[in-house]
Amino acid sequence: MNNRIEAAYEQRPRRWVFELAVALVVAALLIWSGTAVETAGTTQSGATIAWNILAGIFHPDTDLLFNFTTQGVPYLLLETICIAFLGTIVGAIISIPLAFLSASNLTPKPVAFVGRIIIMAVRTVPAFVYGLMFIRVTGPGAFAGLLTMSLCSVGMVSKMYIEAIEDLDVRVLESLDAAGCTTWQKIRYGILPQLMPNFASTAIYRFDINLRDATVLGLVGAGGIGAPLIFAMNAYRWEEAGAILAGLIVLVLIVEWISTKIRVKLARG
């Protein structure tokens, strides 16, 4: 018995050579990646700047933080929320017909393929690049940010909507069809109840992403709180930067908490 076990053990596939080769390749890639990181631009004052930023966050400019004019943090945060919210709504609305046209279980394969190619092309371009493009078209401001958020939302939301549509339970539609329901009744009682929770959850999740992206887009002049933040940091006004960052952190935490509650509610029905 022992001899047969040893013979079977000796005949096992020799995988250790392959595993060792993979480990060596991964180690070599890690070493090469580490050597590619440039540290020549790091200055001795970098630690001081980082400390000043942290000090500004914990000692923000309260006059700016509680300034309710158009130059204050509350107004800039409200503008950022509006850009993210409207961009999400517009993108979600555009994504619905585009997703139905790109769903392979509802439309012919060639049409669905073309729709998916369009969605993939939209998703390929980063939001930062879209922001620069729309600023050239509309000029700096919130409208450029709105267009950017809308287009970026279409790329992601359409993909999620397609997956939800292709996961539809067709047995429900077949039952309604056998019961003699009209097309509108099948949509009302068979399709919408299955899709709406998923659609709403996806839109809320995209709003979270857009809220952060809207801040970044402000750096290129597409409205929102990003531009005042970069101006304050470039001018070494750390208290102002701290006030903006403090307001932004509080806003993101509140929105994240609310959106999580809503998505959990939708998931549980």
Residue ranges and their predicted role:
Residues 1-89, 101, 105:
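N-terminal, non-cleaved signal-anchor transmembrane helix
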Residues 201, 242-269:
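C-terminal transmembrane helix and the adjacent membrane-cytosol boundary/short C-terminal tail
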Residues 140-191, 197-206, 257-260:
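Membrane-cytosol interface at the C-terminal ends of specific transmembrane alpha-helices
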Residues 119-153:
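Generic hydrophobic transmembrane alpha-helix motif, especially the helices
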Residues 66, 70, 74, 78, ...:
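Alpha-helical membrane-protein architecture signal
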Residues 84, 88-96, 100, 104, ...:
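Hydrophobic positions within alpha-helical transmembrane segments of bacterial inner-membrane proteins
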Residues 98-131, 160:
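Cytoplasmic-entry segments and transmembrane alpha-helices of multi-pass inner-membrane transporters
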Residues 79, 83, 227, 231-253:
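Pore-lining and gate-forming transmembrane alpha-helices of multi-pass membrane transport proteins
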